[in-house]
């Protein structure tokens, strides 16, 4: 049986067709929230040192800016003195990757990581669970830790210092906004003949093209 007559042919499935990558992202994220059992907003963040040594880790997307935002992008929060924060300070070019296995979809983003405003970091920090806020103060993220008891002791010390809910945000805890220059949508298809649609920023607009799988 030829592929053209196969009921599972990738060419019998509607292909990706979007005009607005942010609108498409929002729709795919909504689909993922209904399909993924855990953390549909989880994304791989890739950074690189000034000498080009890459590193990657999973972080959580916290917001996507509305169209009127002057630096519209994808926002996450972290310790800015961690490895990723140090690398972003030296080289703000980063990549993000969302993968939703249940949907057979990926979105890949390239762009520049820009620190969020202090007010934005403050606002989000105070929505976090109390122990998470204490942990942010207690952890020297990415630095050597002698043992778990040391971390436990530091958290307990912060808890004693701030017994109530008024826990100040440490200056090194903030966020970044990734302003994209490239957004690629990938849809799994049979026989590895996947569908890829990439948007590239062209001034205030977006150009788009298909890519071979």
Curated annotation (Swiss-Prot):
Substrate binds at residues 62, 124, 128, 132, 192-194. GO terms for molecular function: FMN binding; pyridoxamine phosphate oxidase activity. Its EC number is 1.4.3.5. It catalyses: pyridoxamine 5'-phosphate + O2 + H2O = pyridoxal 5'-phosphate + H2O2 + NH4(+); pyridoxine 5'-phosphate + O2 = pyridoxal 5'-phosphate + H2O2. GO terms for biological process: pyridoxine biosynthetic process. Keywords: Flavoprotein, FMN, Oxidoreductase, Pyridoxine biosynthesis. Binds 1 FMN per subunit. SUPFAM superfamilies: FMN-binding split barrel. InterPro entries: Pyridox_Oxase, Pyridox_Oxase_CS, Pyridox_Oxase_N, Pyridoxamine_oxidase_dimer_C, Split_barrel_FMN-bd. Gene3D superfamilies: Electron Transport, Fmn-binding Protein, Chain A. Coiled coil: none annotated. This is Pyridoxine/pyridoxamine 5'-phosphate oxidase. Catalyzes the oxidation of either pyridoxine 5'-phosphate (PNP) or pyridoxamine 5'-phosphate (PMP) into pyridoxal 5'-phosphate (PLP). It holds the Pfam family PNP_phzG_C. FMN binds at residues 57-62, 77-78, 83-84, 106, 141-142, 186, 196. Residues 145-163 have a biased composition (Basic and acidic residues). The lineage of its organism: Bacteria, Pseudomonadati, Pseudomonadota, Alphaproteobacteria, Acetobacterales. It comes from Granulibacter bethesdensis (strain ATCC BAA-1260 / CGDNIH1). Homodimer. The gene is pdxH. Belongs to the pyridoxamine 5'-phosphate oxidase family.
């Amino acid at each position: 049986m030829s592929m053209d007559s196969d009921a599972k042919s990738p060419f019998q499935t509607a292909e990706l067709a979007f005009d607005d990558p942010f609108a498409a992202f929002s729709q795919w994220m909504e689909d993922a929230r209904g399909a993924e059992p855990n953390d549909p907003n989880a994304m791989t963040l890739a950074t690189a040192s000034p000498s080009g040594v890459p590193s990657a880790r999973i972080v959580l997307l916290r917001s996507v800016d509305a169209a009127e935002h002057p630096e519209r992008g994808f926002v996450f929060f972290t310790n800015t003195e961690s490895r990723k924060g140090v690398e972003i300070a030296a080289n703000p070019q980063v990549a993000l990757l969302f993968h939703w296995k249940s949907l057979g979809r990926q979105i890949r983003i390239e762009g520049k990581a820009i620190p969020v405003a202090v007010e934005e970091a403050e606002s989000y920090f105070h929505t976090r669970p109390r122990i998470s806020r204490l942990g942010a103060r207690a952890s020297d993220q990415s630095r050597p830790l002698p043992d778990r008891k040391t971390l436990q002791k530091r958290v307990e010390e912060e808890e004693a210092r701030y017994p109530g809910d008024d826990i100040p945000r440490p200056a090194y805890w903030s966020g970044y906004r990734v302003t994209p220059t490239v957004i690629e949508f990938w849809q799994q298809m049979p026989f590895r003949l996947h569908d890829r649609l990439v948007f590239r920023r062209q001034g205030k607009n977006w150009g788009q093209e298909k890519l071979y799988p």
